[in-house]
Design a protein with these regions (language model features):
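Conserved thiamine diphosphate
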Residues: 1-25, 144-145, 184, 189, ...
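Short beta-strand elements at the ligand-binding edges of bilobed clamshell
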Residues: 3, 56-62, 121-134, 185-200
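Short beta-strand segments
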Residues: 6, 32-36, 84, 150-152, ...
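Phosphate/pyrophosphate-binding active-site segments
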Residues: 9, 32-34, 46-47, 171-221
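Phosphate/diphosphate-binding loops
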Residues: 17, 130-186, 190
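Conformationally flexible catalytic loops at phosphate/diphosphate-handling active centers
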Residues: 21-77, 210, 217, 221
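Glycine-rich beta-alpha junction loops
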Residues: 35-41, 87-89, 116, 155, ...
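Anionic-ligand anchoring segments at beta-strand to alpha-helix junctions in alpha/beta enzyme folds, i.e.
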Residues: 63-64, 70-148
Length: 221
């Protein structure tokens, strides 16, 4: 978010918009308020409430039941899925949940540049980075995987290799878990719009009821 202040009273709406962007998990980013020197010299009687302390809560968006059930059915139908952990996993503090999810169903996990450090490199199901800046292990596994589960990733060209990495299997499907509706619908993905942590927990509970396991044997080792 960027705004240039031309009148002192404009600061009130500009600050509200800045905090709106900073606390929006889908559209979050930097906020810049440009305050020219001449405006700084002007006076304005701001109301007292404008200076009172306010704590902004970042809400966790829960995915719609229909989308959660759709995600569950996609994963159940997959024999060799792969999870891609993006920057949204770090923002959601969902690293532990991702590891629990992968261990429960024997799903390999790769990390994007933005998502790196959300999981320890020593995690037994981690196959390292993916895409043009990734490693051999994750990119090779993509050849045979039938479902990509993107969690908190924007699926940019560094991750997809301009689609040349993720789409070597012509029958591959994509499930995108993201707080942003735009990023959740990239690559013709089946969307599941919600916070990474709570959405994975909801999907995991249903998959455990179904006793789901992947068909991987020693490929991940």
């Amino acid at each position: 978010y960027w705004d240039r202040i031309s009148r002192p009273e404009q600061v009130m709406s500009a600050m509200l918009n800045a905090m709106r962007v900073l606390t929006d998990t889908a559209n979050c980013g930097t906020a810049v308020i440009s305050l020219p020197q001449d405006v700084q010299g002007e006076s304005f009687e701001y109301p007292d409430y404008f200076f009172q302390k306010r704590v902004h809560h970042v809400a966790r968006r829960v995915a719609d039941d229909y989308e959660v059930n759709q995600a569950v059915e996609m994963i159940k139908a997959a024999k060799k899925p792969m999870l891609i952990s993006g920057g949204g996993v770090r923002y959601s503090e969902a690293g532990e949940t991702v590891m629990e999810f992968c261990k429960a169903f024997n799903i390999p996990v790769s990390q994007t540049q933005a998502g790196h450090s959300a999981l320890p490199d020593s995690f037994e199901l981690s196959v390292g980075g993916i895409g043009v800046t990734g490693g051999l292990a994750a990119n090779e596994l993509c050849k045979d995987c039938d479902l990509v589960i993107g969690v908190g990733t924007r699926f940019n060209d560094f991750v997809t290799g301009s689609k040349g990495v993720l789409f070597r299997n012509p029958d591959i499907k994509v499930l995108a878990i993201n707080t942003s509706e735009f990023h959740a619908e990239k690559l013709d993905a089946t969307r599941c719009v919600g916070d990474a942590k709570v959405t994975l927990e909801a999907i995991m509970a249903k998959l455990k009821e179904a006793n789901y396991k992947t068909a991987y044997t020693d490929e991940i080792e």
